[in-house]
A protein has these predicted regions:
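A short, active-site helix/loop in glycosyltransferases that binds the activated sugar's phosphate group
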Residues: 144-172, 179-182, 367
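Conserved acidic donor-binding segment of nucleotide-sugar-dependent glycosyltransferases
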Residues: 314-315, 319-326, 335-340
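A short, well-ordered alpha-helix in the C-terminal region of glycosyltransferases
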Residues: 328, 335, 342-357, 363-369
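Membrane-proximal helix-turn-helix segments that form the acceptor-binding/catalytic region
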Residues: 23-25, 74-77, 105, 130-150
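Conserved donor-binding/catalytic core segment of Leloir-type glycosyltransferases
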Residues: 5, 190-208, 214-217, 229-230
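Nucleotide-activated donor-binding/catalytic signature segment of Leloir-type glycosyltransferases, i.e.
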Residues: 242-263
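Short hydrophobic beta-strand element within catalytic cores of glycosyltransferases
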Residues: 290, 299-302, 312
Length: 380
């Protein structure tokens, strides 16, 4: 039985974004291995019950300590050598680097999954500039592997990395995000409320844009355009970009947000909303919350950045706003809040766009074809 090994930083990220594709690969006859940093036993047990073989990498998601990196690299190489995968599929920067070096050394087929380029390519600090330089230098070495394929979620990231590295366009592919299953995320008509509901559901990082939404809330309420800002999300305690929980609770006490905490049933939150907002400046792929909202038929508003830009067609399926332009964000959100007919029309078109371009069945089919080609030809 041929082996596919997924190497990814976060166990929760694999469970949220990659399980459907991994299950499809398993159903196609592959033995599935998952190498990740498993925090506790909960997710690892769930994945094992699905028939995946799980391995703990102990790779810290947030640490930029080079000693820790090389210590983890030794363990990961030993683990990957033991697994001996026919295809290694790495997701996010650290796995791409560690797995990339491994595949180059052992001449293995590898897919490097760029689900956004990460904060290394966002922050202009001395430490990040050094890490970015080393990362790009490492990428150039890794990309020389003829069995290496670079998989992106949107064209913006592909164009940027091609401009920054010696990679060839012929060794790249764009697959439209993680996809979403429209048979699970059903279309529904929104409830037209006297006080509309805007949903923000994401990790609680400043770069995800909640602070900008709170500022917009203040401005619109002052104008007499009130709305409920529902906030659901994951608090990342050790992340320097994290919004302190004390700040979240303060906004809640002030009536600026309705803090819901971490919610497992995001689908119900989307159904209960009129608009879904994600004014993110984070370098990411296509945000899942926007895929889910579009499938349910909700108008979305987001900053005009790579992943959001590839999903939302401005003023047709939703609203795009110049990054960090809070004035325009306020204007466009007000337009959505005061135009129920416009929202519904956008929602219908969003659903159609999901079915034709972003359905998970399409993403799964494209991904399985990459595995088949790699195993049949030893290259892409």
């Amino acid at each position: 039985m041929k082996k596919i090994c997924y190497f990814i930083n976060s166990d929760w990220y694999f469970e949220l974004h990659w399980v459907e594709r991994a299950l499809a690969a398993k159903a196609a006859g592959y033995e599935i291995h998952v190498v990740s940093h498993f925090v506790g036993d909960d997710i690892q047990q769930k994945l094992s019950e699905k028939g995946f073989i799980c391995h703990d990498s102990s790779v810290s998601e947030l640490s930029i300590n080079p000693i820790n990196f090389f210590g983890s690299l030794t363990k990961v190489w030993s683990l990957l050598k033991k697994i001996n995968p026919d295809v290694l599929h790495c997701i996010t920067i650290k796995p791409c680097l560690m797995g990339g070096f491994f595949a180059r050394f052992y001449n293995k087929p590898i897919i490097l999954g760029f689900v956004g380029l990460g904060r290394v390519f966002m922050e202009d600090k001395l430490s990040m500039n050094v890490i970015r330089y080393l990362t790009l230098h490492s990428y150039n070495h890794i990309f020389k592997n003829p069995k290496c394929l670079l998989a992106f979620e949107h064209e913006h990231d592909r164009d940027r990395l091609l401009a920054l590295t010696e990679a060839k366009k012929s060794q790249t592919v764009v697959i439209d995000g993680a996809g979403i299953n429209p048979d699970i995320y059903h279309y529904s008509l929104e409830i037209n409320r006297e006080k509309p509901v805007v949903l923000f559901a994401s990790r609680l990082l400043w770069s995800k844009g909640l602070g900008d939404l709170v500022e917009v809330k203040k401005r619109l309420v002052h104008k007499g355009v009130d709305f409920v800002l529902n906030v659901a999300g994951i608090s990342i305690v050790d992340d320097p970009d994290a919004i302190p929980l004390s700040q979240i609770e303060e906004w809640h006490q002030q009536g600026l947000i309705n803090w819901l905490g971490r919610c497992s049933d995001v689908y119900s939150l989307i159904e209960a909303s009129n608009v879904v907002a994600l004014p993110s400046t984070y370098s990411e792929g296509i945000p899942r919350i926007l895929l889910e909202a579009s499938s349910v038929g909700r108008a979305c508003i987001a900053y005009d950045v790579g992943g959001c830009q590839s999903l939302i067609i401005d003023e047709y399926t939703g609203s795009l706003v110049e990054m960090r332009n809070i004035d325009v964000l306020a204007v466009k959100l007000e337009q959505l809040l005061t135009s129920p007919t416009k929202r519904v029309e956008m929602g219908v078109r969003s659903r159609e766009r999901i079915e034709s371009k972003f359905a998970s069945s399409l993403v799964i089919d494209d991904t399985l074809k990459l595995y088949q080609r790699a195993i049949a030809n030893g290259t892409y």
